Every structure is written in structure tokens, then in C-alpha cells.
Amino acid sequence: MLRIYAPASSANISVGFDTLGVAVSPIDGSLLGDVVQIEEIEQGFELESTGYFVRKLPKEPQKNIVYQAYVLFSERLKLRNLKIKPLRLTLEKNMPIGSGLGSSACSIVATLVALNQFYQQPFSKMELLEMMGELEGRISGSIHYDNVAPCYLGGVQLMVQSLGNICQQLPFFDNWYWVLAYPGIEVSTAEARAILPKSYTRQDVISHGRHLGSFVHACHTRQEALAAYMMRDVIAEPYREALLPNFAEVKQAVKDLGVLASGISGSGPTMFAIAPDLAIATKSATYLENNYLQNNEGFVHICKVDNVGARALV
């Protein structure tokens, strides 16, 4: 029996729409992510689901992304003339769906990593990552890697998708604390994409390029202040903030508390705030708990960058 954990991720990081993503883990040691267990059985295939958010999953197993990941992986095995083994997959669904924390990516990554290890790793990291992107595309409508890449590989990942590479890891600031606040409401990726304009002004395009280029440069040259200052979003946040509760007010409030940058995690509704120390992170977390959460399903976690990514649990 093998259990694989895949951590939560925050895509875009304000400045890198569809091109940046970061894996995160709570500093208290709790698991913010999905777990998939795999074990051999006598015959056939079985899929079971447990966990706090299991009630949010599709009722039909064929619509479960874990099942679809199993089917895709099996198809790729057949192309290599490898025998399909009878097995059971159990998804522990700990991530809220439509949260902006890479919920579907967690399930996809944990499943494919578990299957690859179960079959003695017939596929390379890039081959597995390509499958992950394809499965993400089935949910959001287009292939993208900004959640699955950091969830799988850890760290901050920049999507390059050229010269045989899907992504490259960026050097980052390990002293930063990531405060993640999920308000307890759902925003679908498809809905969040539909609200974006079909075209952008020349000035917005120039600003976006300047911000992203400067951010990447600042990461490589270890300029914290410049990196934080350039975490600005002219592509998605001005349009998506209408989907989030009291976003502008909350964003200003955490800035006043001393956070370096804040924004929408992925397509929302989770919000992230980056703090330079634990004291400011704690103050920001308390404020967000009292002013951003909308119901009992909401939560706030103080996190650090998860540099490991998907891994086996002992």
C-alpha cells in the first residue's frame, strides 16, 4: 500500500497569469492538500473517496478526475505494451473545490504520482507533467500547468513550455510567510476565466510584461523589495475582484498591517498575503479570519513555500 500527498498551490501570484505557480504547506505541519492511496487487489479497478470535502465530488465515478487520471494513465501504459494491474485508488479529498488552491491539481498529481510509483516509474517527470496538464485542461477548458507543476515538483515554477521544458523553478525567498485565506465560497475556474476581457489595452500589455520581467529578475538577484513591489496584476484581478467578498477593503487592510504583497490565489476566491515575518503573518491571519471568511467552511493558514512537492507519506 502506498499513500501520496500532493500539496496546495497558488497560481498566478498576481504577476504571472497562467505562467507562475507556487506550492505551499502550513507551518504548523498540517496537510493542506489531497492524499491518494493505491493498493493492488485481486481483480478489476475500484475507486473510493473519503475526506472532509468528499460531498463536493461528482456522484458519478466516471466524472471524478481521479478516475479520469487512472484511465489516461492506463491508456499510456497500453501504448508501451505494459500490463494493467488490478488496483484500488482511495482519494482523501481534503481540498475545497473551486477554492483557488489547486484542488483539482492536488487530486490529479497525487493520483498520477501514485500510479507511476506503483508501476515502477515507467514515465519520466516531463511525461507525467504533460498528462497532468492535459487532465487540468479537461476541467478548466484549456491545458495549463501553473497548479500541477508546483504541486508536483514543489517551489515556485515558471511555465516556459519550450525547448523540451514545461517549467523552470525560480529561486525564491524562503523567509516569506504566505497567509492563505479561503472564505468558504466557491468560484469555478471556468467562471473566473469567462469574466476576463477578450482583449487588453497596449498599456496593460506593456505593464504586465514589465512587472513579470522585473519580478523574475528580482528573484534571481535576491531583491526582495523589488520582487514584492512587482507582484501586481493588470490581467485578472481588476475583473475577478468582483467575485470575492470585500476584496479591495481587505487588501488595503492587510497592507496597512505590513504585508509585502497580496492578491487572488489562482482564480479565487482564496486570497494570499505575503508577510516578511511571523508577527505580521499572525496579525494578518487573525484579521482575515474575522473579516474575509464567510462561513464555517472557510479557513486561514500561515504557510511557507513547499519545496518538495508531491511525496509519499509514511
Swiss-Prot record:
Cellular localization per UniProt: Cytoplasm
Catalytic activity: L-homoserine + ATP = O-phospho-L-homoserine + ADP + H(+)
GO biological process: threonine biosynthetic process
Residues in the signal sequence: none
Keyword set, alphabetical order: Amino-acid biosynthesis, ATP-binding, Cytoplasm, Kinase, Nucleotide-binding, Threonine biosynthesis, Transferase
EC number: 2.7.1.39
Coiled coil (UniProt feature): none
Gene Ontology cellular component annotations, sorted alphabetically: cytoplasm
SUPFAM superfamilies listed in its UniProt record: GHMP Kinase, C-terminal domain, Ribosomal protein S5 domain 2-like
Binding annotation for ATP: 96-106
Entry superkingdom: Bacteria
A GO molecular function held by the record: ATP binding
Pathway membership, UniProt: Amino-acid biosynthesis; L-threonine biosynthesis; L-threonine from L-aspartate: step 4/5
Pfam families to which the protein is assigned, alphabetical: GHMP_kinases_C, GHMP_kinases_N
PANTHER family: HOMOSERINE KINASE, HOMOSERINE/4-DIPHOSPHOCYTIDYL-2-C-METHYL-D-ERYTHRITOL KINASE
Described function: Catalyzes the ATP-dependent phosphorylation of L-homoserine to L-homoserine phosphate.
NCBIfam families per the UniProt record, alphabetical: PRK01212.1-4 (NF002288), thrB (TIGR00191)
Family: Belongs to the GHMP kinase family. Homoserine kinase subfamily.
Protein name listed in UniProt: Homoserine kinase
Species of the source: Histophilus somni (strain 2336) (Haemophilus somnus)
Gene coding for it: thrB
